[in-house]
Structures are given as C-alpha cells and as structure tokens.
C-alpha cells in the first residue's frame, strides 16, 4: 500500500521545466504560507484587542513556531547525513539533535495551539475566531517549514 503511486505519472506541461524552478516555487509557497499565518494572527489581535477576548500569552505559540522554523531550516540535509565538508562544532550528531529540538518545538507549538483552540474557545461557548487564528497560524507555519525544508534541493547545479 505504501508504494501504490510509484508508477503514477502526472500529466507534464512541456512549456515549463519545473525541475529548474523547484527551489523558487518551494520558497515562494513557503513564504506565502508563513506570511498568511502571521497575517491571520495579526488580524485576530486587531479585531480582538482585549485580553478577555484574545489572551496575549497565546502569541507565544506562534513565536515558538517561528523559532522552530529557523532552527529546522538552519540545518542542511547534508549536515544531517554527514555529507558536508565542514563538520561544525558538534558534527552530524549536533545537527541531528538541533533538528530534533526544532521539530519538537514545532509539534509542541501545533499541539499547544489546538489545546488553546479547544480549551479556551470551543468549550467556553465564546467567539471561536481567535482560537482558530492561533491554530491556523501554527498550522500554516508548520506546513511552511515542511515545504521550505523538504521542497528544495541543496544541489547548486541540479
């Protein structure tokens, strides 16, 4: 079941060579998702300025997601595999630990945003939009991180 799409071929457009534009497309899509996540949260903060409506402590999920975005994308895949020419101060093990901590921060922020959504808004029978804004901010930053990390190639002349 895991490889049921291995032989599937998407229809190809002959006018555009996407392999040359892979890094550009992945970077633009990741940037749009990242921007949209923060835009939604800023909109919620403007619409609901009182702490009773949107607690200002709920912004920390987005801050930690953003920190995790930079942590995850600061480590190249070659450093994780051990293929890079420079080993750095901690080498391959340090890169893997750094990447693991980044993913733990990212998943922790996403889970905390779901907790905020359901614990502070859905069960309290108040307006749910601030909770949805916190959740979608973290979800969009999460998907932005995955696209920016794994959607690009690291080969300079691919």
Swiss-Prot record:
Residues carrying N-acetylalanine: 2
Listed GO CC annotations: endoplasmic reticulum membrane; Golgi membrane
Superkingdom assignment: Eukaryota
Matching Pfam families: UPF0220
Membrane topology: Multi-pass membrane protein
Keywords: Acetylation, Endoplasmic reticulum, Golgi apparatus, Membrane, Transmembrane, Transmembrane helix
Tissue expression pattern: Expressed in brain, heart and testis (at protein level). In the cerebellum, has particularly strong expression in Bergmann astroglial cells (at protein level).
Transmembrane segments: 28-48, 56-76, 98-118, 128-148
Localization: Endoplasmic reticulum membrane; Golgi apparatus membrane
InterPro entries, sorted: UPF0220 (IPR007919)
Family indicated by similarity: Belongs to the UPF0220 family.
Assembly notes: May form homotrimers or homodimers.
Protein name in UniProt: Transmembrane protein 50B
Protein source organism: Mus musculus (Mouse)
Gene this protein is translated from: Tmem50b
């Amino acid at each position: 079941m895991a490889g049921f799409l291995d032989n599937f071929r998407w229809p190809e457009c002959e006018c555009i060579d996407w392999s040359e534009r892979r890094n550009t497309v992945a970077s633009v899509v990741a940037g749009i998702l990242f921007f949209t996540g923060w835009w939604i949260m800023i909109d919620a903060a403007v619409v609901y300025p009182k702490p009773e409506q949107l607690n200002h402590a709920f912004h920390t999920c987005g801050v930690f997601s953003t920190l995790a975005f930079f942590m995850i994308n600061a480590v190249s895949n070659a450093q994780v595999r051990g293929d890079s020419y420079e080993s750095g101060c901690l080498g391959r093990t340090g890169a893997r630990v750094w990447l693991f901590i980044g993913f733990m921060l990212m998943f922790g922020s996403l889970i905390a945003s779901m907790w905020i959504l359901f614990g502070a808004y859905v069960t309290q029978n108040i307006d749910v939009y601030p909770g949805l804004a916190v959740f979608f901010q973290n979800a969009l930053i999460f998907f932005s991180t995955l696209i920016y990390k794994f959607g690009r190639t690291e080969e300079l002349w691919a």
